[in-house]
Regions:
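Phosphodiester-processing cores and adjacent nucleic acid-binding clamps
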Residues: 1-224
Length: 224
């Protein structure tokens, strides 16, 4: 069973072999290629010293893990740009291109491409296969243009000047938190779909409890 002290258990998103495989990536890219890609900024500029760069590679799981992350990142980029052309038209203007490029780089270098692939997968399934109503998105995830292009959210952050950095910020390492709303009747169908596809051992329910101090409890009861 999973416990709170266990390391995160992230299921693997099945990338079509026609797109690429880890074995192909190991032949195509050297460790130096990965080192540069994961420690430079989105424009290829060196932004950290060697010690910090090596620590970052280690934090991401070492080169063994980086090949998988890069494969996921490249496939995520394909889906994002495909979605961008549906959202913004075939000719993407410079602002849209730069925003997507920046966001994809942050997602990749923080090690989260697989997470976004899985989220877009079950949201797409909810809409297209399960006939479940999905909310338009709320919280900080609405600030992501990539999430908008993937169909995770339905709010254009560029149009409304929403900040991506409130959602993911490399200077404040934290797991991405995407609030997703499903209709009451369909929520169970989505959960069953995710469990069947990714495995029961990779799916968990989480509940939080809030407590009130004496003064607040009395005040809250008095409102009734």
């Amino acid at each position: 069973f999973y416990s709170i002290d266990h390391a995160p258990i992230m299921p693997t998103f099945a990338i079509p072999e026609s797109f690429g495989t880890e074995e192909e990536y190991r032949k195509k890219f050297t460790e130096k290629d990965l080192f540069d890609e994961f420690t430079q900024d989105e424009n290829g500029n060196v932004v950290m010293d060697e010690a910090s760069a090596k620590a970052k590679i280690e934090r991401l799981g070492g080169y063994e893990k980086l090949y998988r992350i890069k494969l996921e990142a490249d496939y995520l980029a394909k889906l994002a740009y495909d979605g961008a052309r549906r959202r913004y038209g075939e000719e993407l203007d410079e602002e849209v291109q730069e925003r997507i490029k920046f966001e994809l780089h942050i997602m990749k270098t923080m090690g989260f491409p697989g997470y976004f692939l899985i989220v877009q997968d079950f949201i797409s399934a909810a809409r297209e296969k399960l006939d479940v109503s999905v909310g338009p998105g709320r919280g900080s995830a609405a600030g992501s243009a990539v999430a908008y292009c993937l169909g995770i959210t339905q709010i254009d952050p560029i149009k409304y000047d929403l900040l991506f950095e409130r959602f993911l910020n490399p200077d404040r390492i934290s797991l991405p938190d995407i609030d997703v709303d499903f209709d009451d009747d369909g929520r169970g169908r989505v959960l069953n779909w995710v469990t069947e596809k990714y495995g029961q051992e990779k799916v968990a329910h989480i509940i939080t409890y809030g407590t009130m101090a004496t003064k607040l409890a009395i005040k809250d009861v008095a409102r009734v």
